């Protein structure tokens, strides 16, 4: 019994020990196989009287080869091979501001769709602004400034001509002031002879030297249509409004369709306009040349400030650009080399004793008001005298003596005798209250 058990244990240990013959090899599988216990019989004569069998239900973990392919796995089709996805190509980065500008330009409506732009002066300016903004890529404030500089460059020849005339007037200013003083005194005193004599002499002097006092003022007036056209064009664009104009500003005035929230632009424009007029950047005549012009120039910027303070910032952008161009222009035209190239006469420095004394603003204003009142009184008196003369020429002759000299007096009574005087007074007693009704003939 003990020997049989010992033999059975040895056979069992042999079965449990990993062997090469128990490894499955790759290849077609042959089923059914012989039972693993077919050769595991134990002889009865050694162990027991009847045979014993041991069945191994599962192989050990080292009994299976990792390179084996089972029958079930051989029947399953291999999955399709999916090619690896290539990495995305590098896309050049675009700045956010440029991308926004491109998108906005693509989505922005044209001025023709918005009802702006035409062949009128206002429409042509709007078309030019649209070209600067859309085609050249300038922001709205830059487009307005560029169009302003372009317009000012076109009228620059007229400004140069005005500078020439202003230089002539300044060089002959002492003689002009003398003639003006004579004319003013003759007008105040009512001396028509002296008035016409001084006026004729002044006219002859101006023709001799080719001087026209109002020519420097007329030439810059050609800029008035340009300014009005720019003003109307920008105001229409702001009132519509153009969508991109609401974000085309600068610094604190990003929205060009609204007025300046802190009123900096109106004040700066007023200050620059005063400097332009005071320096004579447009006319070439400094404010010290003519007294009445100096007073008018100093009052005009302050007078227009309450009217223009609520204008859209797009209008102020044009106005500020124009004023800055004018200040740079007057600084450039004061260079002697530039004046020589442009054939502008040099300004003569006059002796202060030969010029009329300058008065203060209030004193000159009061004197001018007084002179205007006196001139009005003289004109009123002349008008009344002229009316009396016309009435006397059209109406009947008025009697200017006590009796009618055409009446025949008595032969014995001379005209100056008491009888004649009594007879004449008795005959005209009824008409003595209204002697002017008597007429000759």
Curated annotation (Swiss-Prot):
Residues 1-113, 161-212, 282-298 are mitochondrial intermembrane. Residues 135-139, 234-260, 320-441 are mitochondrial matrix. Mitochondrial membrane insertase that mediates the cotranslational insertion of integral membrane proteins into the mitochondrial inner membrane. Essential for the activity and assembly of cytochrome oxidase. Required for the correct biogenesis of ATP synthase and complex I in mitochondria. Monomer; predominantly monomeric at low salt concentrations. Homooligomer; predominantly homooligomeric at high salt concentrations. Associates with the mitochondrial ribosome. Associates preferentially as a dimer with the large ribosomal subunit 39S of the mitochondrial ribosome. Interacts with OXA1L; promoting cotranslational quality control in mitochondria. It comes from Bos taurus. One of its GO terms (molecular function) is protein homodimerization activity. It is found in: Mitochondrion inner membrane. Residues 418-429 have a biased composition (Low complexity). Coiled coil: none annotated. It is a multi-pass membrane protein. This is Mitochondrial inner membrane protein OXA1L. The keyword Ubl conjugation does not apply. Pfam families: 60KD_IMP (PF02096). The gene is OXA1L. One of its GO terms (cellular component) is mitochondrial inner membrane. It comes from the Eukaryota. Belongs to the OXA1/ALB3/YidC family. Residues 405-441 are annotated as: Disordered. Keywords: Membrane, Mitochondrion, Mitochondrion inner membrane, Phosphoprotein, Transit peptide, Transmembrane, Transmembrane helix. The keyword Mitochondrion applies. The modification Phosphothreonine is found at residue 400. GO terms for biological process: mitochondrial protein quality control; mitochondrial respiratory chain complex I assembly; protein insertion into mitochondrial inner membrane from matrix; protein tetramerization. The modification Phosphoserine is found at residue 364. The chain crosses the membrane at residues 114-134, 140-160, 213-233, 261-281, 299-319.
């Amino acid at each position: 019994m003990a020997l049989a058990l010992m033999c059975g244990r040895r056979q069992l240990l042999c079965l449990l020990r990993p062997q090469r013959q128990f490894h499955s090899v790759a290849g077609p599988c042959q089923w059914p196989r012989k039972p693993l216990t077919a050769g595991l019989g134990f002889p009865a004569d050694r162990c027991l009287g009847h045979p014993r069998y041991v069945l191994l239900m599962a192989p050990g973990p080292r009994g299976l080869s990792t390179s084996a392919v089972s029958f079930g796995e051989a029947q399953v089709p291999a999955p399709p091979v999916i090619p690896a996805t290539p990495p995305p190509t590098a896309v050049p980065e675009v700045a956010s501001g440029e991308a926004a500008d491109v998108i906005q330009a693509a989505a922005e409506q044209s001025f023709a769709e918005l009802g702006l732009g035409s062949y009128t002066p206002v429409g042509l300016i709007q078309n030019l602004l649209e070209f600067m903004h859309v085609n050249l890529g300038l922001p709205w404030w830059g487009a307005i400034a560029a169009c302003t500089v372009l317009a000012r460059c076109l009228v620059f020849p007229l400004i140069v001509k005005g500078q020439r005339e202003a230089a002539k007037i300044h060089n002959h200013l002492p003689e002009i002031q003398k003639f003006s003083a004579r004319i003013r005194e003759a007008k105040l005193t009512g001396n028509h002879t002296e008035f016409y004599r001084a006026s004729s002499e002044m006219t002859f002097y101006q023709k001799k030297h080719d001087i026209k006092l109002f020519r420097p003022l007329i030439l810059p007036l050609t800029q008035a249509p340009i300014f009005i056209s720019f003003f109307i064009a920008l105001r229409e664009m702001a009132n519509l409004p153009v969508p991109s104009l609401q974000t085309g500003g600068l610094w604190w005035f990003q929205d060009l369709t609204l007025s300046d929230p802190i009123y900096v632009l109106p004040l700066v424009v007023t200050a620059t306009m005063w400097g332009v007029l005071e320096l004579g950047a447009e006319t070439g005549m400094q404010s010290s040349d003519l007294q009445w012009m100096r007073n008018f120039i100093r009052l005009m910027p302050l007078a227009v400030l309450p009217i223009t303070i609520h204008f859209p910032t797009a209008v102020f952008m044009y106005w500020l650009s124009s004023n800055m161009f004018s200040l740079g222009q007057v600084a450039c035209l004061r260079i002697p080399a530039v004046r020589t190239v442009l054939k502008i006469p040099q300004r003569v420095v006059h002796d202060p004793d030969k010029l009329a004394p300058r008065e203060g603003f209030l004193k000159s204003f009061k004197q001018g008001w007084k002179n205007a009142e006196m001139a009005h009184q003289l004109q009123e008196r002349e008008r009344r005298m002229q009316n009396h003369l016309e009435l006397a020429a059209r109406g009947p002759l008025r009697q200017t003596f006590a009796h009618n000299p055409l009446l025949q007096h008595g032969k014995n009574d001379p005209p100056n005798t008491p009888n004649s005087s009594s007879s004449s007074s008795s005959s005209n007693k009824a008409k003595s209250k209204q002697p002017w009704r008597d007429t000759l003939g």
